[in-house]
Amino acid sequence: MKEDFLHLLWKQQLHTRQNARLADGSSLTILKTGYRNSNSGPDFEQAKIVIEELEWVGSVEIHVRASEWYDHEHQSDPAYQSVILHVVWEKDADVFRLDGTVVPTLELKDKIPLEVLLRYRELMNPAPKSIACESFLHSVPAIRMTGMQERVLTERLERKAREILKRWFLNGKDWQETFYQTLAHTLGLKINAEPMLMLAQSIPVKIFASLGWNEEKVFSLLLGQAGFLEEESIGESNIAMRTEYLFLAHKYQLESHLLAWKKFRIRPGSFPVHRVLILASMVHKLPDWFRLLTENDAQPSSFFSTGPFQPSPVLEGFLHETSPFKGKITWRPFLKDSLIINFLSPFLTAIGLEKENPDYIEKALDWLSAVRSEPNSVTRLWTSFGFECNTAATSQALNELYTGYCLSRRCMDCSLGSYFLGRGS
């Protein structure tokens, strides 16, 4: 038995309520279960109950065993003086408030319908199952599934946004620096995200600004600092780039880092050198990107409207040697979608949270709804159960639902699990 199950039993009133009695035999009528408290203190606040015709308003605390009241030292905590009811699975002790008065106890172990317990056991069954509630997913009302998707999509965006805000704070609340570093981290994918971030951190964005965002200097700095202009690895056509890098590295006193690039078992388009080239082509236009992000009427297409990146003669040789680019960096559809999903939308959300402006968050949600879904094993699993997955908003939500709830069996926190437990009761 877990406490989160008892929380759900209380919140949805899934226990037997007719002629309800407390552990001491007193009559109990529940008028309001109260509001879940996500901070310290009792589990539910502003509950309203009637005990032996006397109305009480206050807090409700929930434990598996009554003795946990003492394990958590609630008897000496003033915050629990307001508790009017102790809801437990098993009453193994009497409990008292700070002032010495007894706390009424509702014991649930003999008050739960058998069908509710069987459904709970099915959800918590340790047998391997892709989704614990898969046997009844077909019966979930569409409005409930939609509501859960909207909730977890917001949770996913906000979680990513808070990571960006941590970086923003470490960068002295510099949005442009944070934009640049987050872009690099995103382009590195999971396999090279950290080396890409370290690369960006080793060349502050103010250096590019002082160089007027010059195309050749941006490429030389990033490729050289990444270790891709070493003498033994470049041809004669790229010596000019190395010379430029060495001059700029000395001028700005850049510290060299041995970046641990992972190169094995990855697709050519994900090779570190290719990802650094993409980063350089975007840093070259970074001021425009950042300005577009904060414009009210900006659309995702605005960021990729410039067409293929056209290299200068100095860069042509290098690009020619780094297949599959062969002289140009194009905005491939999957790259556009990936940047909108994993970079632009979370960054918009971060700005919205920091400025307390929901318009940015709404824009992020709209952009995700305008992008195609990304196919993966999780989205294929959900579609096998009959759920449509046509946009990135849906695929991101279903990924979050699976990884954040299904895998960790957070069924009691999920509206699908609570529907399963409560149906017909």
What are these regions (language model features)?
Residues 152-397, 410:
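Hydrophobic, aromatic-lined core segments that form the binding pocket/scaffold
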Residues 127-170:
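Intrinsically disordered, low-complexity linker/loop segments enriched in Gly/Pro
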Residues 396-425:
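Cysteine-cluster motifs in flexible loop/terminal segments that predominantly coordinate metals
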Residues 1-8:
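Low-complexity, highly charged intrinsically disordered N-terminal segments
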Residues 8-67, 80:
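N-terminal ordered "arm"
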Residues 83, 87-145:
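Compact, glycine/acidic-enriched structural inserts
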Residues 56-94:
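Aromatic- and glycine-enriched beta-alpha-beta binding-site module
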Residues 33-38, 46-51, 68-76, 91-97, ...:
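Catalytic micro-motifs at enzyme active sites that drive phosphoryl/nucleotidyl and oxygen chemistry
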